[in-house]
Amino acid sequence: MANHTLAPEEDYDVLIVGDLNNSGTEQCPRDDATVLLAHVVPQLYTTVFLVGLLDNFWAVLILVKYKGLGHVENIYFLNLAISNLCFLLTLPFWAHATSHGGTLGHPMCIILVTLSSVGLHSEALFNALLILQSYLVLFHVSSFFSAARKVPCGIITSVLAWGVAILVTLPELLFHKSRVGTQQYPCLLSRPHFLSGKDTSWEHSLTVKTNLVVLLVPLLVFTVCFVLFLRTRKTLGSGDRKYDLAKLVFAIMVVFLLMWGPYNVALFLSTFKKFFSLSDCRSGSALDRSVQVTRVIASTHCCVNPLLCVLLDEAFRRHLCCCCRLGGDTARRPPEDPAHDRPREGLEQSTSV
């Protein structure tokens, strides 16, 4: 029979949990963070699910029905909304499992982990692609960059991004298992029987992978493009459509990094706490609490992007009003044909979502 070492200190759903049960280590008393989250998470996740489902649905509707997918930016925005929906679909199950316990079998655990992880990793990749695309729209007109702005290129890069997101999720499926009869940890990571009890390389690898894809790659792309943007922004006016696109895309990336960055940092410190001399009970308890709290906060991000579009993009607000106006002639207007748009006019579509 497989001899799994359970990892009890953290996370109800996805990514990494540590291992406090290694032999020879000090057994530390539990704090009340998990109990508190068990009361907060169900209501919070249910609210986020309802809000996120509604606003991401409107985002998809506006992109497909009104703006069309004739621009690479709109293709990336559509995939970004789909990524958020993948993540959103798991929240009611985590909320129910956290409040009732004993409801997740192993197949359901794997399905939820897959949706959650693929949604998160793909969102990080599409944020990076949007930053790169907005930079190309702003400053490059050569034939190579013009080819990169064509729809076939957008479709190919989207397929590749989804493929990468699925590939980096596969290792997590090997280590996740359900835990029946608990309200706190319905789905967690465990060490497979074929690894020795002292082998923590699998946990380190998963943490590094998560930090690399979700934090470091988007942060690197954002930093490079933002520095280049600051060096050349004087060539753009504040009312330029290209400037509006960049403002929206950079705002989306900043919010993503602010909400997911703390979780990735806390996760890294928790996993490598022995290397940072943070293995004592007090530090370990603080790290466990930080990972749990930052994870819950980060999970609410999946409903934020459409709200940013409403705040920052006039075209999105206009089309949203068209969607809500019953019987209006404007709402029945077919998607715009990019073949008849002038280059500057086409950028209006790029800023809509």
Regions found by a protein language model. Give the residues of each.
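Intrinsically disordered regulatory tails of 7TM GPCRs
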Residues: 1-29, 314-353
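Helix-to-loop junction signature of class
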Residues: 45-49, 62, 86-101, 113, ...
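Cytoplasm-facing ends of alpha-helical transmembrane segments in multi-pass membrane proteins
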Residues: 53-64, 88-92, 118-142, 157-159, ...
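Extracellular TM2-ECL1-early TM3 structural module of rhodopsin-like
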Residues: 37-43, 72-130, 137-148
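Seventh transmembrane helix
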Residues: 261, 265-267, 289-342
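Extracellular N-terminal segment of 7TM GPCRs
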Residues: 1-54, 193-201, 206-211
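Loop architecture of class A 7-transmembrane GPCRs
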Residues: 28-30, 105-113, 146-154, 167-216, ...
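Intracellular effector-coupling site of seven-transmembrane GPCRs
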Residues: 158, 188-203, 207-214, 227-266, ...
